[in-house]
């Protein structure tokens, strides 16, 4: 009988302990050391998702981990994806395709089917590589959930994986969490744990030695590393908790006389694919902040309405907070000054239209039609069919996503040192679509122009003639370095600032993954980890 593929698994004492990032780190380390490696997470609950080349959906974290392995994204890496669309239910996606919306008890009954799919996907993927790196979810010691576990110890047992238990030391109480987790595990589960890794440490690691002795004495498990707090890593956040925490300390406004652009993301209860903002956050002249109320808006240069897993519900939330009224008030120029550019992506794009129709009850209990924000003269009709595809598009000649600012004509760079902010040939953009519904211009409902188009001429984005409002279904539209800088420079000119005129921040995950791997390699005992896996370094590849 063939031996199972060696497997390492990252589990945590809590959510947001850093399992996804550390999984990516070990994927890149193993790749650097000469192994064919692939990531795997049996079940992911997330609103950040990605689309494979063949139009299948999986968690965004596994797409980043695939990049760490320098592999194309494969749906087998995340066979079960849960996308919460209410407080008690989720859309269930199995092997990249939605199988229905389920409440908690419905999904519990469905879990044996989901676990069968997960095991089959794992076995197939593991047969293609030298070593697997698995990620768990939450904590393996949730005693009320263990009977239905398919993502932590049950998956580790199937894979015969060696488990590293990760604790977030920055939150405090990590040693109690490690001991408590081990106490709540069954004996067979404890046997799978190879050791502990502390994550997000700030300070002198030598001061931790007394705690190691106590915890190892109680559990019999060694500490295999202390990973430092990683600043400005340049990789997408795992979930909305970490994303909101990252931006929580931003200043409420950026002084009008400063050189920084103030870009606001409107927070939504069911926000999805907020990774659309990651590339903007890397720009040196941009401050991105999250707002939840009209009082926090200030006077930004741009406002972004992000994706949503429950567009109708989040639109109602905007109204109840007063945000809908505030956004509409900012649509018009006041006092002779240009108002902020307002951008909608996916669900945010749908909200910006005049109407949202849901005749099949995709997002509601019954057929309904709701008024949108009325910022774009378009209407969306929800449908049960889910659009999942990668898309390449190009900006319409001379359009740069911020209107034509005073003193700057498209494609001329007039009066601003010759910097070409809106090129005549247009910018190439690439991304993916994940949505229910079709959006079309209203017949006779006001002027709206195509601003992005695919190679066959199909519209991929719409804008008002003045360029102040535009929307697209394209997740990742700001990942394109040229378009992103052109848009930001147009915002700068709109504010009376000099355009930068060149790409200064390249959105490339590969160097960030190498930096991550270097830090983690230095922080953990790779010799011990290779030993428990029955492997040895083959000699590092050139990166």
From Swiss-Prot:
- Which cysteine pairs make disulfide bonds? none
Identification of the protein by name: Cobyric acid synthase
Q: Which SUPFAM superfamilies match?
A: Class I glutamine amidotransferase-like, P-loop containing nucleoside triphosphate hydrolases
Q: What role is this protein assigned?
A: Catalyzes amidations at positions B, D, E, and G on adenosylcobyrinic A,C-diamide. NH(2) groups are provided by glutamine, and one molecule of ATP is hydrogenolyzed for each amidation.
**HAMAP family from the xrefs?**
CobQ (MF_00028)
For this protein, the record's CDD domains field holds: CobQ_N, GATase1_CobQ
Q: Which domain of life is it from?
A: Bacteria
